[in-house]
Amino acid sequence: MKIWKSILFTTLLSCGAVAAPVELDKVAVIVNDGVILQSDINTAMKTLQANARQSGKSLPSASVLKEQVVEKLIIDTLQGQEADRIGVRIDDNRLNQAIAEIARNNNQSVEELAASVQAEGLSYPEFREQIRKEIAASEARNALVRRRINILPAEVDSLADQLAKETNATVQYKIGHIQLRFTDGQDKSEVEAQAKALVKKLNDGADFTEMAYTYSKGPKALQGGDWGWMRKEEMPTIFADQIKMQNKGSIIGPFRSGVGFHILKIEDVKGLETVAVTEVNARHILIKPTVILSDEGAKKQLNEFVRRIKAGEATFAQLASQYSQDPGSAAQDGELGYQTPDLYVPEFKHQVETLPVGSISEPFKTVHGWHIVEVLDRRQVDRTDSAMKNKAYRILFNRKFNEEAGAWMQELRASAFVEIVDDNNDN
């Protein structure tokens, strides 16, 4: 069945609007201050039976089927009432987007979708309005259920650790190792100081293999500290305890064991999915238009700042500190620190993403006022740990949402006034 047909079926369940004339209608169910008509039930029953015949599927007895259909219509009515109660409104733009998405999912144009709907006996305007109601009901349910969900940081951390372990189980690491041993009577703080000095040299670019040949007393010293490829479960415990999904090139340590201090290098990684983001360090000057200072005046003032900076008459830092109307960054000479561009408003984000390092922008306007910005630096930052926690949060949210949505609907049903006016099986 095409996607739109499944939506059409839901629509028929909810509104029972068909082109064929209906005999004298009557109220079948009262739901709070709303009603479900007998024609709604009859149409839904006939639609289900027709779909079952086309697909070769069997259905329960008419009485059981009717009971299920009525219950579905009651729940739909209650959710629609909740949407009205909290004031959810779906405008035409949002509705048009949803209709276009339904058409795309069925490889149709909107016009073709409308023709298909009408061919099934439902007027297209009624179809549109029912989709509007369904979106509103869905948004109301989402908003009301979210309020019931509480996710503790400890839950996120625990699941993130579990996910990391599962991911790490298949990851292979090529490990380099330097061991500095304790000797009898030696001050252990001296060994620690030596290890820290080696780590500094390694972080400054010293060759790990050469350092291992020179200083290591470990079992792989004669191989330049190379332990080859290993999964965590194959490593010595003191290694495995330190490996936490670090990237290729990471220097780990120094860390202590009973025999001395150790330094590891992750020479390479296989099978690890990492998440890296670009952070930008920028500084800016903000001038806010007022009843006295027009947009043109603010822009002119910033252009004068750019001229003075380029002429060497003043520095960006001096002007930001003296004139910027962003008090937080003005106190830091205009610097915003390393941030991901997504944190900024769109116009500012575009500037910090596209400006070369060391360049100053032309004056531009955002909701905050007029700016000039200079990009000081860019860097790649590993956000694998944050991504894992975000994934854990989404999993927990989805689990709890499904649980709470079921509980919410049961409570909604239990607290509603529902009266079956006519329980005769007309089918």
UniProtKB/Swiss-Prot annotation:
Keyword Ligase: no
GO biological process entries: Gram-negative-bacterium-type cell outer membrane assembly; protein folding; protein stabilization
Parts forming coiled coils: none
Transmembrane segments: none
InterPro entries the record matches: OMP_Chaperone_SurA, PPIase_dom_sf, PPIase_PpiC, PPIase_SurA, SurA_N, Trigger_fact/SurA_dom_sf
Cellular compartment(s): Periplasm
E.C. numbers: 5.2.1.8
Catalyzed reactions per annotation: [protein]-peptidylproline (omega=180) = [protein]-peptidylproline (omega=0)
One Pfam family recorded for the sequence: SurA_N
GO CC annotations, alphabetized: outer membrane-bounded periplasmic space
Residues in PpiC domain copies: 170-268, 277-377
Signal peptide: 1-19
Entry keywords, A to Z: Chaperone, Isomerase, Periplasm, Repeat, Rotamase, Signal
Molecular function terms, GO-annotated: peptide binding; peptidyl-prolyl cis-trans isomerase activity; unfolded protein binding
Function: Chaperone involved in the correct folding and assembly of outer membrane proteins. Recognizes specific patterns of aromatic residues and the orientation of their side chains, which are found more frequently in integral outer membrane proteins. May act in both early periplasmic and late outer membrane-associated steps of protein maturation.
Classification via HAMAP family: Chaperone_SurA (MF_01183)
Xref: NCBIfam families: PRK10770.1 (NF008038)
Domain comment, as recorded: The PPIase activity resides only in the second parvulin domain. The N-terminal region and the C-terminal tail are necessary and sufficient for the chaperone activity of SurA. The PPIase activity is dispensable for SurA to function as a chaperone. The N-terminal region and the C-terminal tail are also required for porin recognition.
Protein name: Chaperone SurA
Species of provenance: Vibrio parahaemolyticus serotype O3:K6 (strain RIMD 2210633)
